[in-house]
């Protein structure tokens, strides 16, 4: 089973809302909607793994909290600076959720 992290993105939320509407109007079954979401999880993880080539570095002023549970790291950072080739972005708070990409779940 793939990670479901991307269901809370704009794309994932829109997909879920559309599926809920189709279920409400009787156009698809809840089982089919569930299968669509599982396929979305697999596809988005594969696409990000294979197609995204951009690199970004970041530096945090402070690591506020960290947690490791079920092969998932959660980091809460303060005063973070992200750098791409020609662009720098500074933010007050960032939450990073990092999953094991080698676990065979993709």
Swiss-Prot record:
Any one GO biological process: RNA polymerase II preinitiation complex assembly
Disruption phenotype: Females are sterile.
Tissue: Ubiquitous.
InterPro entries: TFIIA_a-hlx, TFIIA_b-brl, TFIIA_gsu, TFIIA_gsu_C, TFIIA_gsu_N
Domain of life from the UniProt record: Eukaryota
Stored CDD domains: TFIIA_gamma_C, TFIIA_gamma_N
GO cellular component, one term: heterochromatin
Job description of the protein: TFIIA is a component of the transcription machinery of RNA polymerase II and plays an important role in transcriptional activation. TFIIA in a complex with TBP mediates transcriptional activity. Part of a rhi-dependent transcription machinery that enables the generation of piRNA precursors from heterochromatin while maintaining the suppression of transposon-encoded promoters and enhancers.
Family designation: Belongs to the TFIIA subunit 2 family.
Subunit and interaction comment: TFIIA is a heterodimer of the large unprocessed subunit 1 and a small subunit gamma. It was originally believed to be a heterotrimer of an alpha (p30), a beta (p20) and a gamma (p14) subunit. Forms a complex with Moonshiner/CG12721 and Trf2.
Stated name of the protein: Transcription initiation factor IIA subunit 2
Source organism per UniProt: Drosophila melanogaster (Fruit fly)
């Amino acid at each position: 089973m793939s990670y479901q992290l991307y269901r809370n993105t704009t794309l994932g939320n829109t997909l879920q809302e559309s599926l809920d509407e189709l279920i409400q109007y009787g156009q698809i079954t809840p089982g089919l909607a569930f299968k669509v979401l599982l396929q979305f999880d697999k596809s988005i993880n594969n696409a990000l793994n294979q197609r995204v080539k951009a690199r970004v570095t970041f530096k945090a002023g402070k690591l506020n909290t960290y947690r490791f549970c079920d092969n998932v790291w959660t980091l809460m950072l303060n005063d973070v600076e992200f750098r791409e080739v020609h662009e720098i972005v500074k933010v007050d708070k960032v939450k990073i959720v990092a999953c094991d990409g080698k676990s065979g779940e993709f």
